Amino acid sequence: MSYGRPPPDVEGMTSLKVDNLTYRTSPDTLRRVFEKYGRVGDVYIPRDRYTKESRGFAFVRFHDKRDAEDAMDAMDGAVLDGRELRVQMARYGRPPDSHHSRRGPPPRRYGGGGYGRRSRSPRRRRRSRSRSRSRSRSRSRSRYSRSKSRSRTRSRSRSTSKSRSARRSKSKSSSVSRSRSRSRSRSRSRSPPPASKRESKSRSRSKSPPKSPEEEGAVSS
């Protein structure tokens, strides 16, 4: 079957999906292998749009469902071109031709089981959600740590300001007490002597020295 040929009428057929194919496996090779179990209506190998190489899986259509089941039981785990095949029932119908799919809406993926973009999108969404949650958690943690550091710096600045004010108040009180003691000492030094000392000085001044005999004779004459 050549690439780009429009698909045949596959209504009423049973499709098998064959995984783990090599890039050199051709539709004719698959047809010869699967025709041993019944009449094969169609063999389709999806290829890359740009490189035209096989994507590693194929779909084999049988006219009879029982032949498809026999082929699945026999070929699942068989080795073809050095690869162990995985054969299962296909879930979806065959997609339309690529020429028509460009104009219309995107078709369903031919076959099932983890090869389409739809099967990968939930995983990507889960990953993006987990990444967004981890980012939000890291942001909240960073904000919490920032607020903690800010509160610590504020408390430290407050404690340092309190200690500085306490030191200043202590220095002021010590300077005031020193000035008071100095003023008291000066006032004590400048204060007059006591009354007893004054009386003794006045008595000593009032007492005159004793007169000589010459002075006494002059007075008597």
From Swiss-Prot:
- Tell me the keywords, alphabetical order: Acetylation, mRNA processing, mRNA splicing, Nucleus, Phosphoprotein, RNA-binding
Q: Where is this region: Disordered?
A: 92-221
Top-rank taxon of the source lineage equals Eukaryota
Record PTM N6-acetyllysine, positions in chain: 52
User: InterPro entries, from UniProt?
Assistant: Nucleotide-bd_a/b_plait_sf, RBD_domain_sf, RNA-bind/splicing_reg, RRM_dom, RRM_dom_euk
GO annotation terms (biological process): mRNA processing; regulation of alternative mRNA splicing, via spliceosome; RNA splicing
Positions bearing N-acetylserine: 2
Where does the record place it?
Answer: Nucleus; Nucleus, Nucleoplasm; Nucleus speckle
This protein's major location comes to nucleus
Q: Where is the composition biased (Basic residues)?
A: 117-171, 179-189
UniProt-recorded Gene Ontology molecular function terms: RNA binding
Chain ranges of the RRM domain: 14-92
Q: How is it modified after translation?
A: Extensively phosphorylated on serine residues in the RS domain. Phosphorylated by SRPK2 and this causes its redistribution from the nuclear speckle to nucleoplasm and controls cell fate decision in response to cisplatin treatment. KAT5/TIP60 inhibits its phosphorylation by preventing SRPK2 nuclear translocation.
**PTM Phosphothreonine: at which residues?**
22, 25
Q: Name the GO cellular-component terms.
A: cytosol; nuclear speck
Per the record, residues carrying Phosphoserine are 2, 26, 189, 191, 204, 206, 208, 212, 220
Oligomer status and interactors: In vitro, self-associates and binds SRSF1/SFRS1 (ASF/SF2), SNRNP70 and U2AF1 but not U2AF2. Binds SREK1/SFRS12. Interacts with CCNL1 and CCNL2. Interacts with SCAF11. Interacts with ZRSR2/U2AF1-RS2. Interacts with CCDC55 (via C-terminus). Interacts with BRDT.
Q: Describe the task this protein carries out.
A: Necessary for the splicing of pre-mRNA. It is required for formation of the earliest ATP-dependent splicing complex and interacts with spliceosomal components bound to both the 5'- and 3'-splice sites during spliceosome assembly. It also is required for ATP-dependent interactions of both U1 and U2 snRNPs with pre-mRNA. Interacts with other spliceosomal components, via the RS domains, to form a bridge between the 5'- and 3'-splice site binding components, U1 snRNP and U2AF. Binds to purine-rich RNA sequences, either 5'-AGSAGAGTA-3' (S=C or G) or 5'-GTTCGAGTA-3'.
Task: Family membership, please give it.
Answer: Belongs to the splicing factor SR family.
Task: Please report the name of this protein according to its UniProt entry.
Answer: Serine/arginine-rich splicing factor 2
Origin species, per record, is: Sus scrofa (Pig)
Query: What gene is this protein translated from?
Result: SRSF2
